[in-house]
Amino acid sequence: MIRPRDELGTATTDSAQKIVLLGSGELGKEIAIEAQRLGVEVIAVDRYANAPAMQIAHRSYVGDMRKADFLFSVVEREKPDAIIPEIEAINLDALFELEKDGYFVVPNAKATWIAMHRERTRETLAREAKVPTSRYTYASTLDELYEACEKIGYPCHTKAIMSSSGKGSYFVKGPEDVPKAWEEAKKKARGSAEKLIVEEHIDFDVEITELAVRHYDENGEVVTTFPKPVGHYQIDGDYHSSWQPAEISERAEREVYRIAKRITDVLGGLGIFGVEMFVKGDKVWANEVSPRPHDTGMVTLASHPTGFSEFGLHLRAVLGLPIPGEWVDGYRLFPMLTPAATHVIKANVSGYSPRFRGLAKALSVPNATVRLFGKPEAYPGRRLGVAIAWDKDVGEAKRKAEMVAHSIELRTRSANWHSQDYEKRKHLL
């Protein structure tokens, strides 16, 4: 693992620090931007050419990251200081082997292995970290799924054991929905659906992400620093809007930090963790954890100072560089710059060479901006950008971010202009 660092080299020279990004989407792109600002050499890897992070990396490789030989060839050629997974579709055995050979897998291979599988994740949260979760059970056949849903009670949630972004998940309102839930998992999971997890429905006030970052302090000891919790909401199980700070009680906020600390202490390593939780009043339940920057955390591009977004925090931790913080009531907290919010810009058409319009209106809104990710292909539901807004009132930031996002229209080579339909879809107002 990286040790505390006081110096950095220069990219493309023999003094360079190198990172390999396994996954080159919008989150990897922001990590790459932060790395470029510190003179770190960036190697981007993904399954398709010209992925967002590849567009600004020093070098890139295209291949199937589920194949160990491909990963070994890239790492052995580049010999990076850190290997940073950004997606789930990675050969986990290869990560363990590379770690055994002395490479730094961020945060560590075991944490990545746990987080990419819902059964391993849930058992780690409930049994090792011993934090509150919703009630849950598992099912491997359709008959078992009927039994599991009856056991947990309706309504409940079913999720493929390996997937992400809501793919293969279903909200089961009654027995009549069980076959559809089974079919959804089998057809749409991004990974394995050999088993489903069935979870109790929590009637929460807000869903939050705590972006806990493990890093070295000034004494060379590993500590955990906590930014303010990020509120978010989803559509079809996928992030649609986020804001910071989440509107929760002080008591709930302290419980969020306590739960995140227990989970990240169990997982170990260095870097940022997106710990997803449900909050109702003062009660908090852990849901899932991602050992890397979280899509809801893009709000920190505005809410945190320059260089200290979740991506900057992740990179500092990975490189062994310091992160400022202040101890309050036993927790090391990272200060916000301003309340802020994001709202996604999603494709509703298919095709190559996406083109955007409405930017004159969108970029005329004070204290707001747009990030377009540079993905070369669109398909319905694919996230192609995000609107970001900031304001002293987080509610106003939410409103502004949604308005800006829905000002953007999209077309591709094979489809005419389509709007985001702001007037028809005022989710937050």
Curated annotation (Swiss-Prot):
CC terms in the record's Gene Ontology section: cytosol
Domain spans labelled ATP-grasp: 123-319
Residues the record lists as binding N(1)-(5-phospho-beta-D-ribosyl)glycinamide: 26-27, 86, 295, 375, 382-383
The protein's Enzyme Commission number: 6.3.1.21
Catalytic reactions of this protein: N(1)-(5-phospho-beta-D-ribosyl)glycinamide + formate + ATP = N(2)-formyl-N(1)-(5-phospho-beta-D-ribosyl)glycinamide + ADP + phosphate + H(+)
Residues the record lists as binding Mg(2+): 276, 288
Class of the enzyme per the UniProt entry, highest EC level: ligase
Keyword field contains Metal-binding: yes
Pfam families referenced in this protein's UniProt entry, alphabetically: ATP-grasp, PurT_C, RS_preATP-grasp-like
Keywords: ATP-binding, Ligase, Magnesium, Metal-binding, Nucleotide-binding, Purine biosynthesis
Gene3D superfamilies, alphabetized: 3.40.50.20, ATP-grasp fold, A domain, ATP-grasp fold, B domain
Physiological role: Involved in the de novo purine biosynthesis. Catalyzes the transfer of formate to 5-phospho-ribosyl-glycinamide (GAR), producing 5-phospho-ribosyl-N-formylglycinamide (FGAR). Formate is provided by PurU via hydrolysis of 10-formyl-tetrahydrofolate.
Family membership noted in the UniProt record: Belongs to the PurK/PurT family.
Assembly mode: Homodimer.
Record NCBIfam families: PRK09288.1 (NF006766), purT (TIGR01142)
Xref: HAMAP family: PurT
Protein name: Formate-dependent phosphoribosylglycinamide formyltransferase
Organism this protein belongs to: Thermococcus kodakarensis (strain ATCC BAA-918 / JCM 12380 / KOD1) (Pyrococcus kodakaraensis (strain KOD1))
